[in-house]
């Protein structure tokens, strides 16, 4: 969807609801934890099962997912993610392709749903 139409807010609202019963990890490559918490708090209480991570490095994210084993992951947004193994800039076709492939492998390997948002 177009920038600014509320994709991030909608995803965060879904995460808040699901985090009442599940361990949910919301990964942002665009906003700080403070910004995300402020937005989440405007929607209501911040759920205990909702965890925030502000990171864009795929290798770091992979390690966290393998260690923490969340039950649901949201990536906001896929264009900000990058792999050190790909020489192009974040947001490039090759980086988005690599990021998508890594998250697909993680979803299958860890048996968890991973939602990918674009800018």
What function would you assign to each model-found segment?
Residues 110-112:
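A short helix->loop->beta-strand "cap" motif at the edges of active sites that frequently abuts
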Residues 2-5, 9-108:
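Conserved inter-motif catalytic segment of the P-loop NTP-binding fold
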Residues 119:
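Conserved H-loop
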């Amino acid at each position: 969807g177009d920038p600014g139409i509320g994709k991030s807010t909608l995803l965060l609202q879904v995460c808040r609801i699901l985090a009442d019963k599940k361990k949910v990890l919301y990964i942002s490559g665009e906003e700080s934890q403070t910004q995300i918490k402020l937005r989440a708090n405007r929607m209501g209480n911040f759920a205990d099962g909702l965890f925030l991570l502000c990171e864009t490095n795929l290798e770091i994210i992979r390690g966290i997912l393998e260690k923490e084993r969340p039950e649901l992951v949201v990536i906001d947004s896929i264009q900000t993610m990058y792999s050190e193994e790909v020489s192009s800039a974040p947001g490039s076709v090759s980086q988005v392709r690599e990021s998508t492939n890594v998250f697909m492998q993680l979803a299958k390997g860890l048996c968890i749903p991973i939602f990918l948002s674009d800018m």
